[in-house]
Amino acid sequence: MDTPDYKRVVLKLSGEALAGNDGFGINPSVVNLISAQIKEVVELGVEVAIVVGGGNIWRGKLGSEMGMDRAAADQMGMLATIMNSLSLQDSLENIGVATRVQTSIDMRQIAEPYIRRKAIRHLEKGRVVIFAGGTGNPYFSTDTAAALRAAEIEADVILMAKNNVDGVYNADPKLDENAKKYEELSYLDVIKEGLEVMDTTASSLSMDNDIPLIVFSFTEQGNNIKRVILGEKIGTTVRGKK
């Protein structure tokens, strides 16, 4: 049996990832593909927590640019992440993966409230835990939510599965054919060079808590989530303090 390099991981999925080529909304076939890959990882004995974005439905920053109150726009974005999380939970449970959604905003008729000790207990029992609603506060991204939850549950690594991007580049590879892909760099490099990996708040939080980040594409052939967990060098690794 393959031996994973990590025992407990936080998987960060963008909202756009759930939309697939549709660009908007939730594409059930894409969600099912992601769920099947996650199931393979769970079967390795890895404890999997997930943070999903909401950009396939709504972006708070866009609402703010349209003249909305930023806090209200961000709250709409939090609700979008909860919709995505419920979709992913349903897909996972349909293939036999026990899953719990925990929300940063109290809505007990729909999901559990986020309780750190309870989340860890779920993970220890082999359940997937999806952290929904971001941090529960406006002005904070779901990347920051992933960094925060990873620190709280003492995750070994944050896995950032990107849609059609296979790592971190010094320029947009879709626009610049000479863009250079990084194999490895530090959070300080990310912050100093303004690389579009995580926002500064998320990068600083991950750096301070020495949580490595691996950025990769899950749209390539095969299960890249599993490949990363088994130690295969794909994508870009962002180091913590070490």
From Swiss-Prot:
EC class: transferase
Any single Gene Ontology cellular-component annotation: cytoplasm
Binding-site positions, UMP: 54, 74, 135-142
GO molecular function, a single term: ATP binding
Keyword terms, alphabetized: Allosteric enzyme, ATP-binding, Cytoplasm, Kinase, Nucleotide-binding, Pyrimidine biosynthesis, Transferase
Entries under PANTHER family matching the protein: URIDYLATE KINASE, URIDYLATE KINASE PUMPKIN, CHLOROPLASTIC
Name this protein carries in UniProt: Uridylate kinase
Species per Swiss-Prot/TrEMBL record: Listeria monocytogenes serovar 1/2a (strain ATCC BAA-679 / EGD-e)
